[in-house]
């Protein structure tokens, strides 16, 4: 089970940032919901946010791939979170990779104001490269939890999200219809689709045949 920092009331205490990251289908949203519900049980004031563009399962709820849901507030920008989370003890943010770098500064300010901030997001894009702003969050957070899915090919722990379509956008919304988890060995980053890359490789040079007498 992922490590979780001790839940404390924030009356006069210093806040902190928790990061939950990993590939698709690794349980990031599920873990976020679990922590937020525990905070609610502890009678803390909880506010949950997600990017408005993410309507895959619900327009308003934070929903895991297992369809576990928690009511949230969709926002268009990170700055809105500052205005809406003023009275919260605990702030949860899902799909952080769909926000810009401003979200890091917003969460820093919330933590400095004594709030517990829990951020969940994808840490790599479909090419296997770091996906902002998650690397920056991992650098400033007090607690980082890295989750793994199960490789759809071999069953090993999966750290990558394999895109199954030909779409080239760095961020393409989707679920099992567009992605599956892959381990390092089974992950195949898409190849460039430029004209030059589609040319067949030149045949290997062969030694000349000896002349017959």
UniProtKB/Swiss-Prot annotation:
Zn(2+) binds at residues 151, 154, 183, 186. The keyword NADP does not apply. Keywords: ATP-binding, Cytoplasm, DNA synthesis, Kinase, Metal-binding, Nucleotide-binding, Transferase, Zinc. The keyword Nucleotide-binding applies. It comes from the Bacteria. Pfam families: TK (PF00265). ATP binds at residues 22-29, 94-97. Residues 193-213 have a biased composition (Low complexity). GO terms for cellular component: cytosol. It is found in: Cytoplasm. Residues 185-213 are annotated as: Disordered. It catalyses: thymidine + ATP = dTMP + ADP + H(+). One of its GO terms (biological process) is DNA biosynthetic process. It is an enzyme of class 2 (transferase). The active site is at residue 95. GO terms for molecular function: ATP binding; thymidine kinase activity; zinc ion binding. Its EC number is 2.7.1.21. PROSITE patterns: TK_CELLULAR_TYPE (PS00603). Its main location: cytoplasm. Homotetramer. Belongs to the thymidine kinase family. This is Thymidine kinase. The gene is tdk.
């Amino acid at each position: 089970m992922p490590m979780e920092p001790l839940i404390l009331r924030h009356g006069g205490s210093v806040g902190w940032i928790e990061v939950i990251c990993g590939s698709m289908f690794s349980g990031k949203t599920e873990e976020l919901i679990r922590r937020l519900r525990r905070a609610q049980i502890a009678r803390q004031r909880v506010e949950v946010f997600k990017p408005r563009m993410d309507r895959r399962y619900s327009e308003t709820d934070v929903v895991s791939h297992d369809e576990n849901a928690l009511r949230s507030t969709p926002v268009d920008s990170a700055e809105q979170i500052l205005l809406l989370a003023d009275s919260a003890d605990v702030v949860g943010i899902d799909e952080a990779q769909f926000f810009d770098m401003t979200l890091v500064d917003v969460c820093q300010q919330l933590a400095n104001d004594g709030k517990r901030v829990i951020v969940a997001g994808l840490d790599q894009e479909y090419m296997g490269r770091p996906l902002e702003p998650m690397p920056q969050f991992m650098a400033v957070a007090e607690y980082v939890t890295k989750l793994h899915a199960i490789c759809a090919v071999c069953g090993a722990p999966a750290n990558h999200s394999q895109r199954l379509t030909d779409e080239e956008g760095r961020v393409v919304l989707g679920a099992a219809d567009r992605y599956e988890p892959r381990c390092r060995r089974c992950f195949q980053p898409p190849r460039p689709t430029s004209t030059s890359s589609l040319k067949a490789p030149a045949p290997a040079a062969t030694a000349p045949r000896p002349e017959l007498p």
